[in-house]
Amino acid sequence: MRVRANASVPQPARTQYLAGLDIVSLGSERGERGLSYTPCLEKTAPECFMVRQHVTAIYDYKDFIFASIRREFEVTYLNSALGAIWTIIHPLALITIYAVVFSKIMQARLPAFDGPYAYSVYLCTGILLWTLFSEIALKAQVVFIEQANLLKKVNFPRLCLPIVVVGNGLIRFGIIAAIFAGFLALTGLLPGLVALALLPIIALTAWFAIALGLWLGILNVFFRDVGHFFSVVLQFWFWLTPIVYPASVLPDRAQELIAFNPLATLVMAAQTVVLQQTWPDWRALAWVLAIAVVLSAMTVRLYLRRGPEMQDEL
């Protein structure tokens, strides 16, 4: 049996991942094989079994996930004359503005760095990583609510949606990072082999973001104030992270407190790699990894316990 999203229902352009897409054709021809997704709703089942069932279901729907990522990317630039070229124009304009304003007009300088573009590079590095985190976390904490109609009409693993959020966030980040790398090459600040350290930093940032965003997203289904509260928290969180300012300008006590900010650890690690072109403090990143693991475990446990009730609240 072939299952299709109801095309007669109005669908918002940016939030409807499956508009016009055939669920069965995206699921590795699951329809032809007679397979279907059956969520485990038995709360008394062992949690390890339930986790394994969800992982297997997500793998079976990998084609659906890839198609949804592609669909979201296409919808973003639907009816645009320049289309996907805007993915280059926006970050290029951002980096150019930062470079010109802070390096030429304001002539901002970074302590311990003499280069004219040092502060611009410092700022861009922090903002790029922060944007990756905030985009994934913000979208993940509303993804179930935004896709409520889809979840009610089509039977598929709900956890596919957060994976789509991460995929789209990483694609956009990759485009911006490539342009930023070009800027670093032009200014002679492109790091060498040490740049490989950015890969685990980026991966850890995305992991922490989706773990936090999904945890908040589940809570947001039951308590809608969670999303609004998190948006406010992010504004304070940005300024509590050394992105616009270097941590060295803060009093010693403030620097000690910032060390407990996982985003500060990630941002400063990336800035160390890009500006100082040295390996980051892996021990500092290890505790961020520990936080991500614990937060992921909390999120999985919350989803297994409250997931079956989400359908009634959406």
Summary of predicted features, one role per range:
Residues M1-Q16:
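Short alpha-helix boundary/capping segments
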Residues Y17-G27, G31-L314:
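Hydrophobic transmembrane alpha-helices and immediately adjacent juxtamembrane helices
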